[in-house]
Every structure is written in structure tokens, then in C-alpha cells.
Amino acid sequence: MQAHVSIILPVHNAEPWLDECLRSVLQQDFEGTMELSVFNDASKDKSGAIIEKWRVKLEDSGVHVIIGGHDSPSPRGVGYAKNQAVAQSSGSYLCFLDSDDVMMPQRVRLQHEAAVQHPSSIIGCRVRRDPPNSTERYTRWINQLTPEQLLTQVFTSNGPTVIMPTWFCSRAWFSHVGPFNEGGQGVPEDLLFFYEHLRKGGGVIRVDQSLLLYRHHPQAATHCVLETTIWTHRVRFLEEQALPRWAAFTIWNAGKQGRRLYRSLTAGSQRKVVAFCDVDENKIRKGFYCHEDSQERPKPRIPILHFRAARPPFVICVKLDLTGGAFEDNLRSLHLQEGQDFLHFS
């Protein structure tokens, strides 16, 4: 019988966390039919035995369990494991779960309600971080974005505005967007899927309750992706989705990050940069930034202005929540509309 919701669980050497993760599947208060689709990606620890132990408990409580996997010498990667778990499942809705995280009992029920209302959206939720003081700024960002910012802040270094371990969507929409990139270690498969979702007009919704205990530890797959890889994808997505709307723009930050963005742009996008802006008097006194690596003659010289003298739209390369509120106050004082007059790329 086809389940209503499939919980998609890729597993690789998850022994320390798997009991707690699978117990949270058993404790869901969703009243529809639910199945668990596990794909064991070449685990070499006791993950397989733990899955078998919980299969009995889950099936006794009415949750059908499908187990796939392989025991090759090395794993095929998170994207592959997720795709396999989706392919072997049957539910009309997909609830993604990482093997080191723990769902709150109401997660499936509340996200399913939202997904029924928003069939072409990715549904996320708020999270509780474990340990509580790890990645405080990032956790605040995940939990406090406004509904509008879920779509306007998709260019930042934080990645998807609802994090992958909280994703819930219809199978039909997943099939329309997916599958995940299977490049393996070092590929930001969640970010690439999220960008493709946005390209296809998908929405982003967050259930404003903390429905997941989101673990931070050194073995997490997130730590395997290079910052330079993510940077390249982000710049290309900015150029594809945002910059075509603007004939000219200002880069807010004449320091390292702003100059790095400028140098990363294509020549066509570089020509749209009319100025850098900043609050640092030393940078402003310099008067301009000269792009020494440019093939153009004369080399481009971009003015550096005080932010009050600069004209929107802005691409902002200043990190949020780091200056004790000074940057945020400056931005607010200009009375601009996010998404229209400025975008964050920090």
C-alpha cells in the first residue's frame, strides 16, 4: 500500500546517533500512513544492525520500513544515497532526515499540513542546535528570517534559507526539480538542488516551530565542501537570477570580500559596478579601486564612496549580525526595500 509520507534517511557510519534518530521516527504523532526509506551508504560501523533492530519496532507500530544500500569499500555520497532512498520509497510526500538529527513528535504532521497548502514549495522549520552554543549566528539566521527573506537571502554564504535536514516537499515537486547531484564528497548537493528549485519557480515556506534537533559535529558531511566551490556557485547564481534586473549597481564593502566579488564577476557584470561603498574613512580617502588583473586598457577604476553618497541597488558583502548592530542601523537608515534595492551576498 502506498504511504502518504516517506521519511528519507541516508545513512553512513551513523552509529553514535542512529538510535535517537530512529526513536524520533517512532514518536511521530502524524495520523496518516508513513514509511521509512533508509539507504545505507557503505557504513562500516554497527549502523546496519541498529537499522534492523528498529525495523521491527517501527513495523510493529505501523510504519513500513524499506532498507537499501551497498557495502562497497567507500560511500557513493549524500546525493546518491538520498536519490536511492527516494527511488525505493512510495509516499506522496517526502520528509528528509539526517541520521544524526532528531525530529520533534509533531514534525511530519505540521510540515505535511504546510506542504498540502503549498505543493510547489520546499517546507522547512525552525531548529534547535546541539550543542546549543555552536554556530549561534547561523542558527539565529535560520530561525529568524522573515517569510520574504526566505526568498531574498538565497545568495548568502549560509546556503539554503531553510536547511536541508528540515526539508519536506511533495514527490511530484521533487521529481520536477531533482534529482540531487551525485558528484559525491565536496559537492554541495543541497545548495544545487535549492537553486534549481528556485529557477523553476518554487516557493520557500518555514513552519515557525522548532521541529528538529540539529547536531553540529566534526564528522558532518557539510564540513567536506570547500568554501571556494560554494563561492563559485553563489556568484554564478547571483549573475543569473539577480543582476540581469539591474542596469548598474554598487558593491557595499570596499574591503576584501567586496573586491573578491568584483573580481569573480564576468566582464559584463563588472561593467555594471558603478561604485564600492563603505564606512571606513581610509578606504574612502583612497578614492577608487583599480582592478589590476583586468585585461582592459585603461584598467577599470571603480570609485569608493561613503555609503550615504552611494546609489542603490546594492549587493552587500558585509556579514550580518557581526558589528553589534552598527551595519544593520546604517542600512535601515536608508529606508530601502530588500530584494529590490539591495541583496545580501555575505
Curated annotation (Swiss-Prot):
Question: What tissue specificity is annotated for this entry?
Answer: Widely expressed. Highly expressed in adult pancreas. Expressed at moderate level in kidney, spleen, thymus, prostate, testis and ovary. Weakly expressed in small intestine, colon, peripheral blood leukocyte and liver.
Query: What keywords sit in the KW lines?
Result: Cytoplasm, Glycosyltransferase, Transferase
Where is the protein found, in the record's own terms? Answer: Cytoplasm
Q: Which Pfam families match?
A: Glycos_transf_2
Keyword Cytoplasm recorded: yes
MF term (GO), any: tRNA-queuosine(34) galactosyltransferase activity
What reactions does this protein catalyze? queuosine(34) in tRNA(Tyr) + UDP-alpha-D-galactose = O-5''-beta-D-galactosylqueuosine(34) in tRNA(Tyr) + UDP + H(+)
**EC numbers on record:** 2.4.1.-
GO annotations under biological process?
regulation of translation; tRNA modification
The terms describing its cellular component in GO are:
cytoplasm
What family classification does the UniProt entry report for this protein?
Answer: Belongs to the glycosyltransferase 2 family.
Describe the task this protein carries out: Glycosyltransferase that specifically catalyzes galactosylation of cytoplasmic tRNA(Tyr) modified with queuosine at position 34 (queuosine(34)). Galactosylates the cyclopentene hydroxyl group of queuosine(34) in tRNA(Tyr) to form galactosyl-queuosine(34). Mannosylation of queuosine(34) in tRNA(Tyr) is required to slow-down elongation at cognate codons UAC and suppress stop codon readthrough, thereby regulating protein translation.
Q: What's the protein here called?
A: Queuosine-tRNA galactosyltransferase
- Which organism is the protein's source? Homo sapiens
